[in-house]
Amino acid sequence: MLYFESLKDKFKLNKKQLNKFVFYYEFLKKENQKMNLTSLISLSDVCYKHFYDSLILKEIFDFNNVTNLCDVGSGAGFPSFPLKILYPHLKIIIIESSLKKINFLKQLASHLELDNVCFFHKRVEQHDIAKNGSYDFVVARALARLEIILKWCVPLVKKRGYFIAMKGKNFQQELEASKKIIKQMKVKLVSAKVFELPMQLGTRTNLLFQTE
């Protein structure tokens, strides 16, 4: 429980939230044996490379003022499900191309009693254009090169809304290569937050953009 206690202390989790993260880990570990949801399945990896990495977004943005969050390429639910546990008021929209991951997330949402979660089984570039400009906040974690995910994700963001690209430590080259598309899509880089995961498990960068 040491890893979970560190999450509790860092992110001020209550007992109910902490229990949900414990269940999340156990359910992910169990289902991963059947369907290969993630290669990072040790307790330390899940707690820090998945849960911590997701929850740290609260340090660069106040999600209390966000109504809906669209997670593009959510995989096993990161970062949207940890954020939903922390901020139960959020409406979560999942866009995921893998049906097995969608089915896993539907089961997990039911077990965790997470309401107001919508699922779209499709690639983001196939998402209904009528949904463009619908979302307060869009996030993509380790999905593709920055210039590609900007093209995919920015159209989903409402006017004056936000998009976060979750990247590793070598983000500068991608950012440089994306200057043209950033200008074309009329978004501005608000912040680039670099942080270290606990136990020297890696460096992460969260790039926060705002639409005009």
UniProtKB/Swiss-Prot annotation:
MF terms (GO), sorted A to Z: rRNA (guanine-N7-)-methyltransferase activity
Claim: Glycosyltransferase is one of the keywords in the record: no
Similarity annotation: Belongs to the methyltransferase superfamily. RNA methyltransferase RsmG family.
EC number(s) per entry: 2.1.1.-
Residues annotated for S-adenosyl-L-methionine binding in this entry: G73, F78, E96, S97, S98, V124, E125, R141
GO cellular component, one term: cytosol
InterPro entries according to UniProt: rRNA_ssu_MeTfrase_G, SAM-dependent_MTases_sf
Main location: cytoplasm
Keyword Acetylation among UniProt keywords: no
Function: Specifically methylates the N7 position of a guanine in 16S rRNA.
Localization annotation: Cytoplasm
The protein, known as: Ribosomal RNA small subunit methyltransferase G
Record keywords: Cytoplasm, Methyltransferase, rRNA processing, S-adenosyl-L-methionine, Transferase
Primary gene name: rsmG
Transmembrane segments: none
